Amino acid sequence: MKIAVIGAGVTGLAAAARIASQGHEVTIFEKNNNVGGRMNQLKKDGFTFDMGPTIVMMPDVYKDVFTACGKNYEDYIELRQLRYIYDVYFDHDDRITVPTDLAELQQMLESIEPGSTHGFMSFLTDVYKKYEIARRYFLERTYRKPSDFYNMTSLVQGAKLKTLNHADQLIEHYIDNEKIQKLLAFQTLYIGIDPKRGPSLYSIIPMIEMMFGVHFIKGGMYGMAQGLAQLNKDLGVNIELNAEIEQIIIDPKFKRADAIKVNGDIRKFDKILCTADFPSVAESLMPDFAPIKKYPPHKIADLDYSCSAFLMYIGIDIDVTDQVRLHNVIFSDDFRGNIEEIFEGRLSYDPSIYVYVPAVADKSLAPEGKTGIYVLMPTPELKTGSGIDWSDEALTQQIKEIIYRKLATIEVFEDIKSHIVSETIFTPNDFEQTYHAKFGSAFGLMPTLAQSNYYRPQNVSRDYKDLYFAGASTHPGAGVPIVLTSAKITVDEMIKDIEQGV
């Protein structure tokens, strides 16, 4: 069969490879001039920067894409586990290194607060049990009809997850120390949600980091995009770049998706899998006479969106890779207040920031004697933060100064401004324009309880035959391992339909 995949982000690349490995003819259409989507790369002034995700968790999910296609993952990506997850800075003189080794982890916890290990390990045990339930009964399956969700098994297993509790509540149940609470709460920002709003299930992120470890891909995270692109090439997939989809064509008589309009041409296909940002697809790519019924264009703005981010890609003329960790977090003096600012639409003058120094793990990513630095500051998305004008150069300059002051928390960056030889910024406006991310959301639809599982946009269209959806705003959600899972379960449903002649 001829299959179209819309979008060459990590979801689209993984999905296309899985389909092609089953013997089908696959074409990927990508609006930009490179693959990767939000897993993007910037090469500038001799530096190589990942532009989006940077932390490799759940490496088995990465490997599975290749092995499921009959290939050896080691022929495409080079993975290695990190001994330390990150350095966390509470203040200039207050740094904690978070290890993956259990004995070192216990030593770290006891140095923060004697006796805290028991509560911490109880938290990890509880969250691991919830993760296993969620993975088996909710995350790794689709919901094609109401009875797939509304049944006794889902009711019983869902009750065990205690999804009405928020991430903060679960953490505070086991942990009294405020520093340790912060160590477990900030990761909900990896998927763009407030820990006070995110279901307690999203506490799985620190559990996954500490129990399964954090890895690095040679070449940076973009190495995964390149590996997937090569996998597709080896499987005979055709990738068309600079190919922006104008419309998904619906046959009104048979209510099926049978073509796409791309760069003015109508291209016919047997099935279409769309991995582009779902809200933008529902708003702009469906014909007026054939909207997605649950998500018509006029309702898209009313959905809840994850936060956005202000990113800086900085090159400096000194090599500091032996004085800083690969992954670093610098907390705001008022962590909770900063979270409120992000989700209430206000800019912070004392933000928590994430700092990634890739040459610590791969010297090829910066010129000899120099260092590239990636900084992420969570911000409101463009709906909640409608009063923020990201095109205002005075404003972005002010934010850069805030970030440079915050970076000075790390001793080696105290005089960073005098060493800058390259600087690039990426704002919420850029998320919207580059990736068609609705409201510049960095992680798609916010995974609130009302926008999760059965209540999230589904992988198999309920309105039109031969139309499928995958990606961060669809089930099961955002984050690289999760969108890779989205690709897998969606393709499984498509192949099942093909085999059954549906």
Curated annotation (Swiss-Prot):
FAD binds at V5, I6, G7, A8, G9, V10, T11, G12, L13, A14, A15, A16, A17. It is an enzyme of class 1 (oxidoreductase). It comes from the Bacteria. GO terms for biological process: carotenoid biosynthetic process. The keyword Oxidoreductase applies. It catalyses: 15-cis-4,4'-diapophytoene + 3 FAD + 3 H(+) = all-trans-4,4'-diaponeurosporene + 3 FADH2. Keywords: Carotenoid biosynthesis, FAD, Flavoprotein, Oxidoreductase, Virulence. InterPro entries: Amino_oxidase, Carotenoid/retinoid_OxRdtase, FAD/NAD-bd_sf. Its EC number is 1.3.8.-. GO terms for molecular function: 4,4'-diapophytoene desaturase (4,4'-diaponeurosporene-forming). The keyword Lipoprotein does not apply. Pfam families: Amino_oxidase. Pathway: Carotenoid biosynthesis; staphyloxanthin biosynthesis; staphyloxanthin from farnesyl diphosphate: step 2/5. Belongs to the carotenoid/retinoid oxidoreductase family. CrtN subfamily. PANTHER family: PHYTOENE DESATURASE (PTHR43734:SF1). Involved in the biosynthesis of the yellow-orange carotenoid staphyloxanthin, which plays a role in the virulence via its protective function against oxidative stress. Catalyzes three successive dehydrogenation reactions that lead to the introduction of three double bonds into 4,4'-diapophytoene (dehydrosqualene), with 4,4'-diapophytofluene and 4,4'-diapo-zeta-carotene as intermediates, and 4,4'-diaponeurosporene (the major deep-yellow pigment in staphylococci strains) as the end product. This is 4,4'-diapophytoene desaturase (4,4'-diaponeurosporene-forming). It comes from Staphylococcus aureus (strain MSSA476). The lineage of its organism: Bacteria, Bacillati, Bacillota, Bacilli, Bacillales.
